[in-house]
Amino acid sequence: MIVMKFGGTSVESAVAIERVAGIVKARESQRPIVVVSAMGKTTNKLLAIANAAIDGKREEYIRQIHDLRDMHSREARQVVPLSDRAALDRTLDEHFQELTELVKGLAVLGELTPRSVDAISSYGERLSSYIVTLAFRHFGMKAEHVDSRDVVITDRRHTQAAPNFPETYTRLAKTLAPMAERAVVVMGGFIGSTEDGVTTTLGRGGSDYTASIVGAGVGAGEIQIWTDVDGMLTADPTILAGGHRVKVISFAEAAELAYFGAKVLHPATVVPAIEKNIPVLILNSRRPEVPGTRITSDSVPCENIVKSIACKRKITAVNIHSTRMLMAHGFLHRIFEVFDRYETPVDMVSTSEVSVSLTIDNTSRLDLILGELRQFSEVAVEHDGVIVCLVGENIRYTPGVARRVFNALDGINIRMISQGASLLNLSFVVAEADLPRTVGLLHQEFFSTLDADVFERKEPAHA
């Protein structure tokens, strides 16, 4: 049994869905459970509809709902057989009528609560999974649809719900595992529900997490994350075009990369997979012949020090200075207590005898945090930073990595530098404007030669 997750770009159109059907049909003998994201940018469009409603823009949200229904109907009708068209239209009518009533309620209240965000954003995956199920039947597969809210049970923390693993695993084993023996199972990612049936979501990018949870719950042989890139690369392709494919990487390295911005993987994805020792593959739905990246529980011998360079953008650095800090017991605890109270995670920390510098990416409660910090210290804030993170298990065993970074980046201002507690990463902060040059220089420094067992070199394109 395998779990196959397809992201929004992989199911964004009839053409894309037909491509996915071909990929799944070729693996039908492996008893796939298919997890899909919303079609294209549907989640963003749903949230735009909600915001138009609370702003009182009735004509706008009615038009947006109409356009969204048209898009789903237009693409679905190209991949759904005539015999299922009536059922398709009926289901679309039901879902969009529900959505319209929900949005009208928001317009009356003029308020968008986290619970409402979850209810509205869930429609993307609910629609796409139903359409993909009908499409699979059209292309000759026996396919069954499962509402994820019946099997992925979470707490009540809306927009960032945490799974209730014992209950979820029980339901998955009882429902999905037997179903996968007789049909291709299709379900939406990202969404779940509380035990009493209130819709929740796992956070943006949570479809990867769903796939991992499902894989762990049914004891899958592997979890395949199908994206629009060839796997994990040595650098973000939006920053550096010449990144090489990473053939194999450890769970620990992949988790570090995901946390620090490698968008092909949701940071939490690897946790259930690690616990159940299930390999995860990152594959390209547009180029299914490419082997992608295999993520395994075991460390992978590698001649290169660094496996990949990740970047986390829109970072804010908070610099805290206090002469009273010198030898003061509990000063750091007092600082982190403030960030914890306002539920603001800290990414990096660097300390000296009289100052602490740290970075955050969530600034929604920054003013409140600064107000408390300034009661016992001087605080300066720098915006528009980027965390650049070198990840690789060999970093912990190799002296002089930081020296090589500083030498390679001569002339670029490095604001702070930190080695993670795992010793798998070396991270530092640079200005957004310096990011392309920083990544290019580091890539040249650490990937001029490649271990052929771990990397596939991307040859430069010739005119």
Positions of predicted regions on the chain:
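Glycine-rich beta-alpha junction loops
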Residues: M39-G40, D150, V229-G231, K276, ...
